[in-house]
């Protein structure tokens, strides 16, 4: 490790240590251990030269705890940072290298247990620097077992209000992924134009419809009361009629968990009074904006949101009393007490309909029997990413489609030895 000459001399009263930069081209492996996890300034001088030298060579680069130039608890990175092939981090993942852009520099992350003493003070210090938790593959095993004498009703009843005249596919993908994620009954409330296609693609679903002249809110209210979980918004469009449908759901008197996605979010961003409806809704509310939708909801620029997604999601969650699922390359899930950052998934999932599939997975986890809805939502995001990673192996990032992701869900569950095996 390189130490400042004067600082070293002052502290331990020995003659100054002299170092020289050795060409990194001479080595097959480079261990990066220059800085700790709390770096909060730009890297300058000889350290900047060393980082440039390390990044120029083809040697395998292994960072200790965190790549030099990154900080554990913040998204912003310094002007110079080591681009590691591997990072061996101690005790737990660090937020600054799980979120982008830091994630691009960490390479494959290996968490090493070095026997941190678990005390209240230690836990508090860890949370101050690294407030977020990362879902792991082993968390899939926490999905509650199904009752041996259960039935389709006890496995979870989901209502999906989705699909306008020209965007029926969103409803189909949400329904398919809800079934693939363990839901017992899925009822789709959609435009009448979508009925035949829905019953062809997802014949297990129950279909109720509205048309251009009649929003059928009386029937919709009845099915809101019936449901254990409601999805509202995918492909719904933004119109007077879709506003009426979303308002009907929020004022239905249902206590079902409500997932607001896509056009439901766009409607809310244009109608401030809907926040009052949300505050009076009896059940738990989950909002699932991508960064563009979050920009419209908050008035922040996309750059501001990407610059600090954890703070953005957490503030929004606390302000409106909802679980926020802020979707991006590293999705953030939070409520007023918990923060999760997703580590699964890949760039091939940036395709139309991927978010609609996610809403179905979230609905599945809401119906699975978890006591903690925020954890269940974060687990759903992780499972969705695992399905995308499976598609990367089978279809590749260039060619995967949202339907492929939905169809890969069952393999994620069976390969991880859940009760769905």
What are these language model-derived features?
Residues 8-12, 74-76, 198-201, 336-338:
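Short secondary-structure transition/capping segments
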Residues 27-29, 34-128:
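Internal gly/pro-rich beta-alpha loop/helix module
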């Amino acid at each position: 490790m390189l130490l400042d000459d004067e600082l070293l001399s002052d502290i331990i009263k020995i003659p100054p240590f002299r170092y020289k930069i050795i060409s990194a081209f001479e080595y097959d492996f480079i261990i990066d251990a220059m800085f700790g996890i709390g770096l909060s300034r730009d890297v300058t001088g000889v350290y900047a030269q060393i980082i440039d030298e390390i990044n120029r060579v083809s040697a395998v680069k292994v960072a200790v705890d965190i790549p030099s130039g990154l900080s554990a608890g913040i998204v912003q990175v310094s002007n110079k940072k080591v681009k590691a092939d591997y990072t061996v981090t101690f005790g737990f993942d660090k937020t600054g290298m799980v979120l982008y852009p830091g994630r691009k520099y960490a390479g494959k992350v290996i968490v090493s247990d070095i026997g941190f003493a678990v005390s209240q003070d230690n836990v508090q210090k860890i949370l101050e620097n690294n407030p977020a938790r990362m879902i792991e593959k082993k968390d899939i095993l926490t999905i509650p077992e199904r009752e041996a004498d259960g039935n389709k009703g006890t496995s979870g009843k989901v209502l999906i209000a989705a699909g306008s005249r020209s965007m029926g596919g969103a409803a189909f993908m949400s329904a398919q992924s809800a079934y693939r994620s363990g839901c017992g009954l899925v009822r789709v409330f959609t435009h009448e134009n979508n009925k035949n296609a829905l019953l062809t693609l997802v014949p297990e679903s129950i279909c109720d419809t509205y048309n251009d002249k009649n929003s059928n809110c009386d029937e919709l209210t009845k099915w809101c009361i019936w449901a254990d979980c409601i999805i509202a918004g995918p492909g719904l469009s933004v119109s007077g009629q879709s506003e009426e449908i979303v308002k009907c759901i929020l004022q239905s008197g249902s206590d079902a968990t409500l997932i607001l996605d896509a056009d439901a979010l766009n409607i809310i961003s244009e109608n401030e009074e809907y926040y009052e409806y949300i505050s009076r809704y009896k059940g738990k509310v989950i909002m699932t904006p991508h960064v563009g939708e979050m920009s419209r909801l908050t008035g922040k620029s996309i750059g501001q949101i990407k610059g600090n997604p954890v703070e953005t999601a957490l503030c929004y969650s606390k302000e409106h009393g909802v679980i926020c699922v802020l979707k991006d390359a590293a999705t953030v899930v939070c409520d007023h007490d918990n923060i999760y950052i997703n580590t699964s998934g890949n760039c091939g999932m940036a395709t139309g309909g991927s978010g609609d599939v996610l809403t179905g997975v979230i609905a599945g986890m809401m119906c699975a029997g978890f006591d903690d809805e925020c954890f269940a939502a974060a687990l759903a995001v992780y499972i969705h990413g695992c399905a995308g990673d499976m598609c990367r192996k089978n279809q590749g990032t260039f060619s995967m489609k949202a339907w492929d992701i939905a169809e890969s869900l069952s393999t994620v569950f069976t390969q991880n030895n859940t009760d769905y095996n």
